[in-house]
């Protein structure tokens, strides 16, 4: 049923090896062992960079910067005296009302969240006396008036120069 045995001109080149008989074997540099070596080198490089990044953060010194304003410094100094006095000055100097802490599970109301954000923003802003605020506003108005006067003077000078050039 199989017919004659053909060895020299076999239809399937079973025992013939080399790139001229098999189109898949062209380019002999990327053999399986070479691919394994390349993957191993890439893996080692990846592990090296991961360790390098992980330990580079540990070598740096941690820097903690707090935003401080002049009013915050005075408020923090009064807080330290309150702590040293055992809270006796708390009853007399109640500048900052203490807010009750609410657990996160019960803090579901969106309006309450927004109000809390506003309160936190107000606490972080430096509290300026109304007199200081008025003085700042006056200074700003004076600066604007001076700038307007300077612009008008420059415009008059330009007109005078143009008239002189025209004559």
From Swiss-Prot:
Compositional bias segments (type: Basic and acidic residues): 1-13, 102-156
Residues spanning the signal sequence: none
Gene Ontology CC terms: Golgi apparatus
Q: Tell me which domain of life the UniProt entry assigns to the organism this sequence originates from.
A: Eukaryota
**Residue span of region Disordered:** 1-26, 67-167
Give me the stretches of Low complexity compositional bias.
71-80
Q: Further remark, if any?
A: Present with 2190 molecules/cell in log phase SD medium.
The identity of this protein, by name, is: Uncharacterized protein YKL063C
